[in-house]
């Protein structure tokens, strides 16, 4: 009868009978192997499959309990600590269908993402192009306003020089006619007073006065405008651009006949649209311009 009962005993019953044979309670064993009494009770009730505890931990509990009770490993080696999974042959087919179902969805999402990305790139490029054109327009407007301001300032200086030149001409021309009348009345007296002391000087001065009386229209040529660079518009009109050595615009517009520009300095960059209509005097000397029907671009400098 005993062999039959031993074969029928389960591992949990063996654990319980062995513990009772040693006169040990669950609390005593729990203190020795540092396990909760509830876990030992589950093991004695053959509850080796637990959903809240992984199988590897349950197996460790059984090994520790059997080692403490000095039971052979054959008592618990055949215990199943987890449910065996059945071989599902249709699992691969179901997973394949699921993958194929979602792959088409993923392709549609990918295409939509690509379209949205292209739209974003296009909008970004359009915004950049519009801002670039706006910046270019603002830059052009700034340059044009600067050129217009310089052109508005240059005519004032040109008018001042022309007015001053017009004032100097009558002042210098007025004394020419007065000596004619004075010399007509005082010529004999001057000749008589100076004939005793300086006869040579008298003859020279008398000849000069007589030539002035005989040719009252002849007068010494006086410079109309003074400056290191003088530009005169002789006929029609011409485009004139003048810059100094620092590339600052001194004059830049179309000037008409009779206008005179004067500048002071040593280095200038000039652009003359019609060289045949312009006369340039630099440092008191006439600067020859090449008349070939083309725009003249040159620099003036003096060390």
Swiss-Prot record:
Gene Ontology MF annotations: DNA binding
GO CC list: plasma membrane
Any Pfam family matching the protein: HTH_25
Superkingdom of the organism of origin: Bacteria
InterPro entries: Bact_Cytoskel_RodZ, Cro/C1-type_HTH, Lambda_DNA-bd_dom_sf, RodZ-like_C
Cross-referenced CDD domains: HTH_XRE (cd00093)
Gene3D superfamilies listed in its UniProt record: lambda repressor-like DNA-binding domains (1.10.260.40)
SUPFAM superfamilies for the chain: lambda repressor-like DNA-binding domains (SSF47413)
Name of protein: Uncharacterized protein HI_0367
Source organism of this protein record: Haemophilus influenzae (strain ATCC 51907 / DSM 11121 / KW20 / Rd)
